[in-house]
Swiss-Prot record:
One of its GO terms (cellular component) is cytoplasm. Its EC number is 2.1.1.173, 2.1.1.264. The gene is rlmL. Keywords: Cytoplasm, Methyltransferase, RNA-binding, rRNA processing, S-adenosyl-L-methionine, Transferase. This is Ribosomal RNA large subunit methyltransferase K/L. Belongs to the methyltransferase superfamily. RlmKL family. The keyword Cell membrane does not apply.
Amino acid sequence: MNSLFASTARGLEELLKTELENLGAVECQVVQGGVHFKGDTRLVYQSLMWSRLASRIMLPLGECKVYSDLDLYLGVQAINWTEMFNPGATFAVHFSGLNDTIRNSQYGAMKVKDAIVDAFTRKNLPRPNVDRDAPDIRVNVWLHKETASIALDLSGDGLHLRGYRDRAGIAPIKETLAAAIVMRSGWQPGTPLLDPMCGSGTLLIEAAMLATDRAPGLHRGRWGFSGWAQHDEAIWQEVKAEAQTRARKGLAEYSSHFYGSDSDARVIQRARTNARLAGIGELITFEVKDVAQLANPLPKGPYGTVLSNPPYGERLDSEPALIALHSLLGRIMKNQFGGWNLSLFSASPDLLSCLQLRADKQYKAKNGPLDCVQKNYHVAESTPDSKPAMAAEDYANRLRKNLKKFEKWARQEGIECYRLYDADLPEYNVAVDRYADWVVVQEYAPPKTIDAHKARQRLFDIIAATISVLGIAPNKLVLKTRERQKGKNQYQKLGEKGEFLEVTEYNAHLWVNLTDYLDTGLFLDHRIARRMLGQMSKGKDFLNLFSYTGSATVHAGLGGARSTTTVDMSRTYLEWAERNLRLNGLTGRAHRLIQADCLAWLREANEQFDLIFIDPPTFSNSKRMEDAFDVQRDHLVLMKDLKRLLRAGGTIMFSNNKRGFRMDLDGLAKLGLKAQEITQKTLSQDFARNRQIHNCWLITAA
């Protein structure tokens, strides 16, 4: 009776134990990452040939305590290696784990290799050669704290390498994990199975091999026992012959079918090749098809199972497309696959919530370093009067209502960029802005009292509903998460795409960047203020302080300003402003751009202007600014400096975003200035719901 160990992916240990017991293994004991078991020589070969779940089958040889590198050397050498190796057999050592003595796995492997080689030379036997790439024998040593466990790896290459997949091909899941996903899916062999995002076909191929009683090891060319002196070739050939007979019989008797599709023609070609090499190509129909084209291949029955490992992303900019994909799949399942089962394996449970289906069962597993979940659903049969529910229905209805109202208004106004939704419903705490045929969804960061998982699920529902209501392509939706504006947050850089979109605002053409920064380069709430500046600027010298991307300067220039001066501390935004000016034909000496700390520049400047626009941050303590600035505390100092630059009869338009800002009218009067609040006049229809988004004033000589 041999003592053996089968390793597997985390989360699959109990499933592997059942599989090994069905093969005839006894004394099975589950540990993290595998199963210890016992069996005769035939069971050794059967576990190698038939286990769909084991990563490797090991033959433990012994353990030793390792307090020094000499302990490791002597512990390994104590094993009778000369009775383990066939003459001329090559070997390789895989060493994992470290302790205070063995701090490098390569060093540990070298000490093991030396001990094995010396075991032969001490008996005056030819020393075995090392072959790291294709050894006849693999020795596995695992060091945990002070104990080293030594074993022969009878698998050779990992058992997930069935022999049907090109090793160069990238697989998101190993074949062993794919087999477990099939087993847990609830699918019954003999019923249809469909994978609408099949990639190279691994799930379908593993299912077809299982259904046709085809051993997963049948197509492997190399094994780890080929150089093992105790290998029994006769028993191995019996096990192999039995597997071949069962495979032929299973294929001949199988009557159901498998269906796979993917939008990538290259991976579909690879899937067809893999299925053919696995010996079950005739059972699977592969098609190049997007999920949006998914249809029930058997509308008249029988019912089957949809099984897939859909894509999931770590990057924020990939989420809208993935949310739309899962939402679409959920709708298609309800519309076309009533009575079927659905099973999805994913590293993102939140994405699975976009299906709008209730899971009957779920399982956890590891896919490499990723924590994953597999959820099984039963899709109820639809009735003639059944209507699929939309995620975030209240939000969708409000967005639909706003769209009807603002789309026509924006067209009449001659603007392409406007706010469609601004946290109208407190439970859907986002802003939705339209930029031509693009949409930006900004999630206001939820309070810490809100469960993060629930908040994320709600955001996914919002995105799915937004895409559906607006009828936009998922790649035209940009998702951002932000807190309510604080100081210089608007300048935070998020990416490096450098993709600019040209939009129109009245008679101005402007560049926006929807992805690289927290803001887009165009503050939509200041749209009317910019138009007013254009109407006030004819024949005047115009100054724009804290200019951002210079959109106000563009309006002033198009309004006929004699000259424009644009000042900002950021070189990036000044270059952006220059591009905006050039886009509108505003070039030459009349249009100056100055990179400077605006407060310092203001104190030193001695020029005169007829019209000044200033939109300072609420608060700023930038390292590049000489002093911290607070708009409530410091606005009178600002006005004093601005008055010095203001030509007789001139006007200052002053705006800021501080909620509850109070203008010091008495202080202004002492400076010889007066202020007229024009906030309500500068709020367009799309911002009428949020009357505190900014405040705006016209300031002139008293």
